[in-house]
Amino acid sequence: MYLRILIAVAAIGAMSLTALAQTSEENDVTRKATAERLVMGEKACYRCDLFQVDLSYQDLDGRDLSGARLRQADLSLSTFDHAKFAGANMSIVNGFGMRAEGSDFTGVDFQDAVLVGGWYGGSKFDNAKFNNANLSGSDLSTASGLTQIQLNTACGDGETKLPKGLVLAPCKAN
């Protein structure tokens, strides 16, 4: 009797794993299609799922990615001038060399993000979270909404440019 129950439970578990794998693949296809629509010119992607998508080397000015899930996305060397990211999850994002002039990053989660060498002229960072974010070489000198409390958990280097009166701890060498 117990053996039959155990076999039934194992079979259900195997079916569940197969369903999860299919769902994961379907989600991956959906995320890639959403990213492609953005690249092709779609402006609004409010609260969309862009987990782990590759948007590197793209010109995505004026896009509305408010509330989007960009966790682990590759945004390296892309341009997001006048884009809206308010409330987005940008944790563990690769934002190397990203340009975002006049963009809105209000309430964005940048935990563990690599924002090395980015340019954020005139962008807003009210209530953004920078836990363990690397801002080395980035220019935030004309950004607004940054506070010392926000930056206390991030790091940078001698090339990082911040608004007057704000400082960053140096990043630890790997």
Predicted regions and their residues:
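Positively charged n-region of N-terminal signal peptides that target proteins for export
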Residues: 1-5
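Bacterial N-terminal signal peptides
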Residues: 6-16
